[in-house]
Structure formats: C-alpha cells, structure tokens
Design a protein with these regions (language model features):
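Glycine-rich catalytic cores of cysteine/serine-nucleophile enzymes that process amide/ester linkages
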Residues: 42, 47, 52-149
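A structural motif
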Residues: 133-173
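A short, structured loop/turn motif at beta-sheet edges
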Residues: 37-41, 95-99, 157-162
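Alpha-helical transmembrane signal-anchor/signal-peptide segments
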Residues: 14-32
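N-terminal, Lys/Arg-enriched amphipathic/low-complexity engagement segments
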Residues: 8-14
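Activation targets extended, charge/polar-rich intrinsically disordered C-terminal tails
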Residues: 170-326
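Sec-dependent bacterial lipoprotein signal peptides
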Residues: 1-2
Length: 326
C-alpha cells in the first residue's frame, strides 16, 4: 500500500531520516557548488549557467571562477513572489568589480520526477541545496520561462560586508557538500538561511519575525530594518526594483546584469535628492534661527513659524561585521 502512495518516496524509510547527496538528481542539480578558499582568493566550483528553451528543456553548463575578495563590492537582495503573494523565493547576488554578479539561491535539491510542495517540505522529503549560479541563469529562468516577477533590491552592505557574507555563504555550501541537510519549509529554507548568515556576522541584526516565515514580506522587513536603503518610500523602491521589463529588453545583452539594474541609478538619484533636500531644510532652519533667535518673539510665534524637521535617515545600521571563522 505504501508503495502506491505517490507523495512518498518508495525507498527505505531511512530516506526521510538521513539526508544524502547520493540520489538520482534532476540534470540541473546534479553538481554541488563549492569553494576553495585560498587566502584573499576564492575559487568557486560549479557555477551553473543553463541555456533554456523552456523551464524544463535546457542545456546545463557549469564553469569555475577565481574571485579576489577585494573585488566583491555589493550585495543585492532578490525576491521572487509566489502566486500567493505572502510567500516568495529569496536570493542573494554578489556584485564584482568587473560588473558581473554571482547569485546564490538556497533551494530544494530535486530528484527526477519531484516537484516542490510546502507540505512535503516539512517531512524530510527534500535535501537542502546551495546553488551558485550565473545571474543570467536564475533571473532569466524565472522571468521568461516561469513567468514570475523578480525584484532586485540593492542593500546597504559595504564591500567589507559583502566579502564577509560571501565567505560565510561559501563555507556553508562546503559544509553541505560534506554533511547534507534536509530542507524544511519553515526552519531551513531560502530566507531563514539568509537571515542566519546575516545574524552570524552581526548577531540579532534580523530578529526572527513573521516576515521571515511569510517571505513575501521579507523585502519590506529588510527595508524597515535598514538593510535596504530606506530614504525612499518602500512602494517607490519596490517599483524601481522590479526588473522584468528590463530583462526582456536586454535578454541577450553581454552586460545583462548592469542593464537590468538601470533603475538603480534612479534609486541613487532619488536618495541624493532626498539627502540634498534634508541639507537644504537644515540650512533654512539655521538661517531662521539666526534671524529670529529663540524666545525673541515669544513661544506662540515660534510654534507657528517653526521650520519643518529634516527628513531622517536610518541608512547605516548594516555596520561592517568582523570576520569570523566558519
């Protein structure tokens, strides 16, 4: 009877007790991404770069890349909402000095014939998979072939943050290659792992809240915590972060990653304008104070003529973490 139940593997019950890297994996998940950390350089192995015909018809390509830590410059937070908008897949993309990006996506490692199910994800049905991929692979797959929305949010991470985070992520990938783990829908998924990486570098930087479980809200949560620059209204930031139309326009572009971030310049310009307005407001306040010293015309006049408060900014809570051994 158990053998006829399509929702469970037909292998021994140990399949759901002991995770393993030895299963009949789908073609695009047969290799594990790992890293050789060599002082100030990291050699990333098995970076995936599939060429897709459809979501399920593709040519699998891999390449290795040697990265100097000093070339790591930025970290972007990628959000791919599900049809149920409260849920989303989240990823990190690391920007390098030459304008290219490496994306890290924490996923289930699918066996042949397997599909993702949140319910099965709480019953040790899937192994956890750290995929390091060319950004063109994971973004084009989701926008064109899965018809999903993709949002690319620039974070406030410094280059030092980016290097520390990248090292911690790659050490985790190496760990999973040696000691596999089961994916869990609630406790060991894409978003919870990102949160753990950030909190390892800066303890309690991201409190565990409902926004982590309902990851469709994770970008707003990161915004509220100051991990995304929050000097623009979130809805405006979200609109500028959506890249689907830019992916379509630049699908085959050699500088794909730079072009899909065209609106990041608008984000920076908007932030600069906001900052300049704050400076102008502050300067006006100083001029008014010089012309009308406090108390000269009485409290009533001061209350009526008080200049507006400069708009505050919470940019900067993502402070440079110390490097910690993995």
């Amino acid at each position: 009877m158990l053998n006829g139940c399509s929702t469970w593997r037909t292998n021994d019950v140990l399949d759901r007790v002991i995770p393993t890297n030895d299963r009949p994996w789908v073609a695009d998940m047969q290799r594990l991404s790992t890293a050789e950390i060599q002082g100030e350089e990291v050699v990333v192995k098995n970076i995936r770069n599939c060429q897709y015909v459809t979501a399920n018809d593709y040519v699998v390509n891999y390449y290795d890349r040697r990265i100097r830590l000093e070339d790591l410059r930025t970290v972007d937070f990628l959000v791919v909402p599900f049809q149920t908008k409260a849920l989303a897949h989240t990823m990190l993309s690391f920007g390098l000095a030459d304008g290219t990006f490496l994306c890290v996506s924490v996923e289930i490692r699918k066996e042949l014939g397997e599909e993702y199910s949140p319910l099965l994800g709480v019953s040790n049905q899937f192994e956890l998979y750290y995929l390091v991929a060319d950004e063109r692979d994971v973004i084009r797959l989701r926008t064109r072939y899965r018809d999903a929305e993709v949002y690319v949010y620039p974070t406030v991470a410094t280059p030092e943050n980016a290097r520390a985070l990248f090292l911690d992520v790659m050490r985790r990938a190496n760990q999973l290659a040696l000691r596999p783990e089961f994916y869990h829908t609630l406790t060991n998924n894409c978003t919870t792992n990102i949160v753990e990486h950030v909190n390892k570098l800066q303890p309690q930087r991201v409190p565990f809240g409902w926004q982590v479980l309902l990851s469709g809200n994770s970008a707003k949560y990161a915004y509220d915590l100051g991990l995304l620059d929050n000097r623009l209204p979130f809805e405006e930031l979200r609109e500028l972060a959506r890249v689907n139309d830019l992916v379509t326009e630049n699908f085959e572009s050699a500088d794909f990653s730079r072009r899909i971030r065209a609106r990041h310049g608008e984000i920076a310009a908007g932030l600069e304008a906001t900052q300049n307005q704050s400076y102008a407001d502050a300067e006006m306040s100083e001029q008014d104070e010089a012309e009308f010293p406090s108390g000269e015309f009485g409290d009533e006049f001061e209350q009526e003529q008080a200049p507006p408060e400069p708009r505050s900014s919470t940019r900067g809570p993502f402070r440079a973490p110390q490097f910690r051994p993995g």
